[in-house]
């Protein structure tokens, strides 16, 4: 049986306009007060000046009703307008601010007219609401909330289904924090649907279009797994299948797919509080669909006893697991009973913190460069190092993207900033995107970039920069760390690429659900996937699909090229779950180019440290497919060298990424026959030569390798396997730019700097490209590369970059140039003066001067 939310009709006011702040009443049609059983009008407009006909619990009634307009001298009172009718109204904040709580319930009365209306303002919390309740049975017939504004707005209610029934009004205030109050006035009946005019809204500032009072219009909540699938809204041609649901899976916080397409799922039961050592209850399950019907038929409990596990990824003979303070690797062996641990978890990294248990290390994925990437939230402060390394190798992170190399055992902060990113992916050109919460939602993450932050200050993202700016950071007691390597010389940061938002309000989603629902659903996002599956319609190729928690849907953004980066355009939502409890946390491709989605599924939508507030009994995994083709069985781990290489130009990123990682594993493992000559022998005609210089024009390229993404995949594979030489890279860079892609040149620059010191020949090419290359993408990668070079090495490159006046209006380049330039100015005021003479970008001239005069 479906658990339906209370059904009601909520009609918005007609034309909305600005209100004269000197007025104390809203223009409204004449209404009729409800009457009691003895025929006397009830005090539902408070014009008796007291609370007769109302019954209170708690201290909600203290000091009520309020008389007259809002006191402009009270806290936050300046400019506030109540929009009340008559002299008296219920003003939940006016006497004692947000402290009082309780309920205020009217005497029951009969519905004598087909329509009713009232005014409501105050908070948008579920715990600050006005309800119309049936006297018999106590069923809530209607519920409305404010929109975090003191100005009350009219709500019109269709009561025709309840004619001649007895109902009562109940004002509920269970919240004591910000906007923890209700404003209410003037409940009356109407013979016809009333039309209101001259009503203010929270968005009706000068020059802005006013927003109507939103309705809480999510169709369902608390559905069973089977009902949840039926409730979804999908585009034509798509279908959703329940792959697994409770009791088979509960609290799925992270998942990955192995080389056989099996799902490895982390169930997190310890959140929101890390348990004492040895008391963790999180576990890893493995699901397999052997008949291709989109539903699991084999389930294995792989590992139990993890503590605050938050991320997982397959690779190098096991699974990488994030469980603060550790990055773990659990080796896997195959048995008749399913996959089992082949040994104890190996601790690879230490120092991940958990001050905020919903902002920890999360959403692992393999980058195109062969590193394991992850995200990290802003209100958790980690000091990370490789296990066994000295404290002088710790790197601080409290917002951003990090990466770990599986064979070189290195940890790096890739980019710094944003808020609580919980979703990361790469497009066909290897460009990194994340989603964020609270602040704008979409960012193109560039190596060495510093980004808008929800809170806190920018920090040094490398050990070298931390030693230069905050050398005593490394001398503290990291058992109780307090110091952060804050850098005061950033001056500004990179902003969102999105040209839109998915929520109303300033920063927090302070409006009701429907106001944000029209534009995307809300500020809380989790999970991001760049669709590169190859089996969905072409219109989805390259689009970014991200989960929206408050909006119970999957949003879609379209990254369109502009300058050195992208603009994120809004596209229609891909999927709406129509279920308030749905909270998807990530989505990933499968071997057929369809998509799996994990759903935490919980009535409690926002983070709270109160563990009992979370429902531990449920969780879902859905499969979203296009068409009716059955799932195929794969095992890429059994493919030989030639067949693995043949997967690289696939249009399905699941296949190309897994094939590349397997090749990386086997070369790293010194498997006989997996070397450069063997790779050269098995690559299709011309592509190996094309990327190593001997086929400069690509005349003999196999058809599959004529696309830039396919060429990049080969380039990344050669690098990840260690089979791409310095000479290969230099030959590629030395070609005329019209014979190579700007993306190939850009990636050659990044990969040459992976080992920090690319060599004098490469540095000379960098300086030449900085001066002459026509591509802003190449210049962007050079700016990133400079941050991995010494002051002396980067100087000629920076001098050439900052002379590009055409880059002054680019979204990324002026600030990326500054991040590369700042250490030069810090090293020598004379150098700063020389750079001023070369800089053709006004922002850089300003920042160079500012840094020269800083203490």
Predicted regions and their residues:
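Beta-propeller domains with acidic blade repeats across secreted/periplasmic ectodomains
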Residues: 205-646, 654-657, 661-664, 669
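Short beta-strands within extracellular/lumenal beta-sheet-rich domains
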Residues: 87-113, 126-128, 152-155
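N-terminal pre-domain segments of enzymes
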Residues: 24-60, 65, 190-233
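Extracellular glycan-recognition surfaces and repeat-rich motifs
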Residues: 50-89
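Extended extracellular/luminal ectodomain segments enriched in beta-structured repeat modules
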Residues: 99, 109-117, 164-166, 539
